[in-house]
């Protein structure tokens, strides 16, 4: 499995956080015609709210370029849905930023399972421009901080860490 392909995903929403579709979710009243929704979405693609983060926060130093792009685009998309008129508060941006970082962090957690040490050291954070306080974002299914998990492994499990000729551990 190519980890570079999965690293291109901006966000990962776990299915267990979304309720299963049930008949009571459907309506017998008027609802939104998808043509209008599709046209609205097409028009909103022309606008970008990516700079909303910079007004209030700065992204942490541990995010690589793919992470920064993914978080900015996810925040922009969430703000377009929640505040299409462009008027949002610092708290609105914080909520969207935290959610975007959690969604991107989930991508990294899956990559950690596939790619091992390459994606091991992932610390997502953002810094408040006013207070300069740094906030770290984690997810419930986040893996441990140890290379080899504690406890007795299942029979046949082997952990191997070596140093390459380049000096990189992997």
Sequence positions of predicted segments:
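C-terminal regulatory/interaction module of P-loop NTP-utilizing enzymes
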Residues: 1-170
């Amino acid at each position: 499995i190519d980890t570079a392909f999965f690293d291109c995903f901006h966000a990962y929403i776990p299915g267990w956080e979304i309720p299963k579709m049930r008949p009571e979710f459907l309506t017998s009243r008027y609802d939104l015609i998808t043509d209008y929704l599709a046209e609205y979405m097409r028009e909103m693609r022309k606008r970008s709210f990516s700079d909303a983060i910079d007004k209030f926060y700065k992204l942490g130093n541990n995010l690589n370029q793919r992470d920064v792009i993914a978080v900015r685009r996810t925040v922009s998309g969430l703000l377009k849905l929640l505040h299409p008129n462009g008027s949002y508060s610092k708290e609105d941006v914080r909520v969207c930023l935290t959610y975007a970082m959690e969604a991107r962090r989930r991508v990294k957690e899956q990559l950690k399972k596939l790619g091992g040490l390459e994606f091991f050291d992932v610390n997502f954070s953002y810094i408040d421009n006013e207070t300069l306080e740094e906030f770290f974002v984690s997810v419930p299914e986040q893996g441990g901080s140890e290379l080899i998990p504690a406890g007795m492994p299942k029979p046949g499990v082997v952990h191997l860490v070596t140093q390459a000729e380049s000096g990189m551990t992997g």
